[in-house]
Amino acid sequence: MERPVPSRLVPLPLLLLSSLSLLAARANADISMEACCTDGNQMANQHRDCSLPYTSESKECRMVQEQCCHNQLEELHCATGINLASEPEGCASLHSYNSSLETIFIKRCCHCCMLGKASLARDQTCEPIVMISYQCGLVFRACCVKARENSDFVQGNGADLQDPAKIPDEEDQEDPYLNDRCRGGGPCKQQCRDTGDEVICSCFVGYQLQSDGVSCEDINECITGSHNCRLGESCINTVGSFRCQRDSSCGTGYELTEDNNCKDIDECETGIHNCPPDFICQNTLGSFRCRPKLQCKSGFIQDALGNCIDINECLSISAPCPVGQTCINTEGSYTCQKNVPNCGRGYHLNEEGTRCVDVDECSPPAEPCGKGHHCLNSPGSFRCECKAGFYFDGISRTCVDINECQRYPGRLCGHKCENTPGSFHCSCSAGFRLSVDGRSCEDVNECLNSPCSQECANVYGSYQCYCRRGYQLSDVDGVTCEDIDECALPTGGHICSYRCINIPGSFQCSCPSSGYRLAPNGRNCQDIDECVTGIHNCSINETCFNIQGSFRCLSFECPENYRRSADTFRQEKTDTVRCIKSCRPNDEACVRDPVHTVSHTVISLPTFREFTRPEEIIFLRAVTPLYPANQADIIFDITEGNLRDSFDIIKRYEDGMTVGVVRQVRPIVGPFYAVLKLEMNYVLGGVVSHRNVVNVHIFVSEYWF
């Protein structure tokens, strides 16, 4: 059998196999909803929690499990509320429940049951008032009737109470709650659930069911180890629960809080201190202090013991005495005494007359050392020295300037040294500036002044301009950046697949106005498949075939005595139509005709910009299992449409198959359209046994992409 393979075709058997696999998977996923509901009921009965993860792989089954679990959980909570209504404490014991949702359902049914019993106690009818809900009305009526029967269900029906978990069925009644063997609490001490087959008793949190299946006993969490007391705390069991108590006391001055922590006792606020009336209570951590209320005279202050002690004003007050006087502390006060200093040579009294200060002999306008010297003051005296940058000449007896630049060459300044009277001055070369130390030179960052039109790079003693991508530095000034015309470069013709447009610093590629769009890389043009996107205008009797940059609406009809093959049904928009010979009965001419199949296929080719070797464009594969290799031969031929011998066909053998390869051997400049007629002749003994005809519709685009 042979078939042209022009493009990516999915084999039909694979498609059928995938469909059968999907149908098989769907059949296996059919799960009983009743089994899903049973799983939800079991989760409610066993765990009393519907938030646990559901294990079914079916989404619908998980939804049924969740709904049945919540419905069963509400019935269990309602039965618990009815049972509580029969307890001595009634609905008041609901504070022991932890779940707020559970408490809501239990409380609702407990109250509705209490209303039914109260209605009977007031000699009223057991029909509920219309304002309450339907479910509350059922509980109201059941508890009212139960109270009227005076517990006949538990004691008067002769049922065996040795196994309270299973109770015989009662007569069906119209009211579902009258038919419920758990109404009024049933045989259970705490929680009751009627499954239809049996009555199951259960207990509240903190209790466990006894061996009789009816009674509940407290769980000692302290013995079972199910408590959560911390290290340093002791577990104390309570009815239905437990509490944690510290092992050691908090100590004097502290009390134990409800959360088992130690808190300081404010003895002053609680009034449990023992301070005398003349003292004030001051609270401290773990204790308190008593401070006296005694008032001391002026000049005295209370100490920690409440005694009055003298205040040393000379130490506690800033400058208690006027300038020139000394402070002397006394009992309860202080006195000021005038100072009389005696200054020696080189000292004199300050302006306030309080102390002796040094006489500055070097202070202008006095020049005791003469010109060129430096006067140095000292306590009580002075001395003469040469100024910095000068040295004393013993011959001339004068101070002479030191040329530091000559004496210390290359060691004083980083770049240039210039001598000055008594000192020196450092300077720097171009591109540098003097550092804060006045000697070193540091590089000047010329880029801070933006000398370049785009980017600036500072270098040691200078700077360098450079440009961003798409620009180049001007050869004229070395500062300005000029745009690079990428489209005009020698390689510009290969930058874009269609058209290059230069823009400042870059370029843009464009595609033909129709049939193409720009690829994500911004350079290549991609063909738009109008047949896939649905933007073609083919009629219902035509088939859309995508070609490079456009599309064609074609209609292929099979010749007389031929029918379209089922495997060419164009559901997947394939590019091949195959017609198989189908002769009418007794049509000998049709039977003798060697042509067995007539096929039409469509391919689209670009205009090759560079054509250096033949391009293989289509493959015809044939299998000849009925003919031995030494007797049968397959001859491929191009019979029509080969304009200027632009195409040829060669034969090769691959994987036990004979392959006819159609090649383009000459360049064709589009737009161009031709129909290439190919023949596959099966030759046996020099005679063509049968022939297959393939019509290849070739569309050559005007573009190379």
Swiss-Prot record:
Q: What induces it?
A: Glucocorticoids suppressed mRNA expression and protein synthesis.
Arranged from A to Z, the UniProt key words for this protein are: Calcium, Disulfide bond, EGF-like domain, Extracellular matrix, Glycoprotein, Repeat, Secreted, Signal
Tissue expression per record: Detected in most organs (brain, heart, lung, spleen, liver and kidney). Neurons are the predominant source of production in the brain. Not expressed significantly by astrocytes or microglia.
Compartments reported by the entry:
Secreted, Extracellular space, Extracellular matrix
Q: Where is this region: Self-association and FN1-binding?
A: 358-442
* Principal location: secreted
Give the range the annotation lists for the signal sequence.
1-29
List cystine links.
Answer: 36-61, 37-68, 50-69, 78-109, 91-110, 112-136, 113-143, 126-144, 182-192, 188-201, 203-216, 222-235, 229-244, 250-262, 268-281, 275-290, 296-308, 314-327, 321-336, 343-356, 362-375, 369-384, 386-399, 405-417, 413-426, 428-441, 447-456, 452-465, 467-481, 487-500, 496-509, 511-525, 531-544, 538-553, 558-579
Presence of the UniProt keyword Nucleotide-binding in the record: no
Q: Per the UniProt annotation, where are the glycans attached?
A: 98, 537, 541
Q: Could you give a GO molecular-function term held by this entry? A: peptidase activator activity
Which part of the chain is the Anaphylatoxin-like domain? 36-76, 77-111, 112-144
The processes (GO biological process) annotated in the record are: blood coagulation, fibrin clot formation; embryo implantation; extracellular matrix organization; negative regulation of cell motility; negative regulation of ERK1 and ERK2 cascade; negative regulation of stem cell proliferation; negative regulation of substrate adhesion-dependent cell spreading
Q: Where is this region: Disordered?
A: 156-175
Q: Quote the subunit structure annotation.
A: Homomultimerizes and interacts with various extracellular matrix components such as FN1, LAMA1, LMA2, NID, ACAN, CSPG2 and type IV collagen. Binding analysis demonstrated for isoform C a 100-fold stronger binding to the basement membrane protein NID than for isoform D. Interacts with FBLN7. Interacts with CCN3.
Family as reported in the entry's similarity comment = Belongs to the fibulin family.
Physiological role: Incorporated into fibronectin-containing matrix fibers. May play a role in cell adhesion and migration along protein fibers within the extracellular matrix (ECM). Could be important for certain developmental processes and contribute to the supramolecular organization of ECM architecture, in particular to those of basement membranes.
State what protein this is by name: Fibulin-1
Organism of origin is Mus musculus
